[in-house]
């Protein structure tokens, strides 16, 4: 029999934030993760709110949250005060800074815009050190996209053409630098076979790294913004980027590419290392299969694939299993379910109602806001009965569309901390109704 204070199910950003917050509070914590999370496919920036659920553009996300409880009471942000969301994000900044991964926001706490791999602009709130935070004015003489010979996951010509169409960049010269990484030929059998991890390994070698520096300095100046794919990582990406900046004296902008995203991997590795450093127990490569309940709606234990018939007990459980991509939600032809416990869902009954007629619709597809139904304490229900010691956070929640709104990171971090605080309140025998909104 295994006993913990808090058991966290899911190893994405919500799961690690919940587990870290519990560890900080002195709770004996275990995190069960199936393996690589959606962070391997993420931009590495933390979006808080780029649009309201009705589609209105947001510049100041915390101000926009104030109206959500009246207009969209089902939204996860409506169950927390804006200041709690803000404090949660700064808590994440502190955690990652301790692991050598600083994140930065604007001084006025408004959104900034990052240049995407497609040459578009996307609103976000926290970005990594080598992400150019665009507001409106462009201080660079030229923007130069770096094309790596043999690298298939970044198309600078497409990005360049799209960025030229944006009004903020129409006065800028936008060009391209073609570079070759020594050693690539030995790794590929086809003309365009290299992935970011392959190039990251090569750039650890001084010859390859110095060659890249020389090629960049040959074409770029200090007046330019050099836009390059995220090809430095594998544990020391920021160290190499800092070295690249020192040797070239250039202003660099990293863009995430097709998976694996080295920017996202940096965040996952930093959170995992911090959790283990703080004394957390990580069951990686394991899967929670089911749970046992008592008559009052308490989850008494969970079973995992690797533990077999050994139950895992906790005072409180945090479900951070993710959405469709992470299999926290599963869709069949006629229904959408939460597969571990079979929790009550918010979802339209007929498949025809799951989507809009047009794929590229101006409004959000309904299925993206489907998820587990929770009360003001982020507690789900099972067959109509409230689960007394199970709390949900992150993209398993219903009531919001993280893609349409650009709110995935903010919801994940803030609901993770809210779930843990409410779980600890339960353990400390607080009244369930004592405080519904932190």
UniProtKB/Swiss-Prot annotation:
Its EC number is 1.1.5.3. GO terms for cellular component: glycerol-3-phosphate dehydrogenase (FAD) complex. Its cofactor is FMN. The keyword tRNA-binding does not apply. Keywords: Flavoprotein, FMN, Oxidoreductase. It is an enzyme of class 1 (oxidoreductase). GO terms for biological process: glycerol catabolic process. Gene3D superfamilies: FAD/NAD(P)-binding domain (3.50.50.60). Pathway: Polyol metabolism; glycerol degradation via glycerol kinase pathway; glycerone phosphate from sn-glycerol 3-phosphate (anaerobic route): step 1/1. The keyword Flavoprotein applies. Pfam families: FAD_binding_2. One of its GO terms (molecular function) is glycerol-3-phosphate dehydrogenase (quinone) activity. It catalyses: a quinone + sn-glycerol 3-phosphate = dihydroxyacetone phosphate + a quinol. Conversion of glycerol 3-phosphate to dihydroxyacetone. Uses fumarate or nitrate as electron acceptor. Belongs to the anaerobic G-3-P dehydrogenase subunit B family. NCBIfam families: glycerol3P_GlpB, PRK05329.1-2, PRK05329.1-3. Composed of a catalytic GlpA/B dimer and of membrane bound GlpC. This is Anaerobic glycerol-3-phosphate dehydrogenase subunit B.
């Amino acid at each position: 029999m295994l006993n913990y204070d808090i058991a966290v199910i899911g190893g994405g950003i919500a799961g690690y934030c919940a587990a870290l917050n519990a560890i900080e509070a002195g709770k004996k914590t275990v995190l069960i993760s199936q393996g690589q999370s959606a962070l391997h496919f993420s931009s590495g920036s933390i979006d808080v709110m780029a649009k309201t659920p009705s589609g209105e553009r947001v510049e100041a996300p915390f101000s926009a949250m104030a109206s959500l409880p009246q207009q969209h009471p089902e939204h996860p942000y409506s169950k927390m005060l804006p200041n709690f969301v803000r404090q949660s994000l700064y808590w994440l900044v502190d955690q990652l800074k301790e692991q050598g991964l600083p994140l930065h926001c604007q001084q006025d706490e408004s959104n900034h815009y990052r240049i995407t791999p497609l040459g578009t602009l996307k609103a976000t709130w926290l970005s990594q050190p080598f992400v150019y935070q665009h507001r409106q004015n462009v201080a660079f003489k030229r923007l130069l996209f770096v094309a790596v010979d043999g690298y298939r996951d970044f198309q600078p010509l497409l990005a360049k053409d799209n960025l030229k169409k944006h009004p903020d960049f129409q006065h800028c010269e936008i060009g391209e630098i073609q570079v070759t990484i020594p050693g690539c030929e030995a790794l590929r059998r086809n003309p365009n076979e290299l992935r970011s991890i392959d190039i990251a390994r090569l750039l650890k070698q001084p010859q390859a790294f110095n060659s890249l520096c020389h090629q960049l300095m040959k074409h770029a100046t200090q007046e330019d913004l050099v836009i390059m794919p995220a090809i430095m990582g594998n544990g020391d990406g920021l160290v190499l980027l800092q070295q690249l900046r020192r040797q070239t004296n250039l202003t660099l902008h990293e863009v995430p590419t097709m998976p694996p995203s080295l920017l996202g991997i940096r965040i996952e590795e930093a959170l995992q290392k911090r959790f283990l450093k703080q004394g957390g127990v990580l069951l990686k490569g394991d899967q929670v299969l089911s749970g046992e309940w008592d008559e009052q709606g308490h989850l008494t234990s969970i079973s995992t694939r690797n533990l077999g018939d050994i139950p895992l007990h906790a005072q409180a459980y945090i479900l951070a299993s993710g959405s469709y991509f992470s299999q926290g939600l599963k869709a069949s032809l006629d229904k959408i379910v939460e597969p571990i416990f079979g929790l009550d869902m918010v979802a339209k009954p007929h498949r025809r109602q799951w989507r809009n007629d047009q794929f590229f619709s101006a409004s959000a597809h309904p299925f993206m806001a489907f998820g587990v139904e929770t009360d003001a304490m982020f507690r789900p229900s099972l067959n109509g009965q409230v689960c007394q010691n199970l709390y949900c956070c992150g993209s398993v929640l219903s009531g919001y569309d993280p893609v349409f709104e650009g709110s995935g990171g903010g919801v994940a971090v803030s609901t993770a901390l809210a779930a843990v605080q409410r779980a600890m309140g339960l353990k400390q025998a607080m009244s369930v109704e004592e405080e519904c909104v932190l």
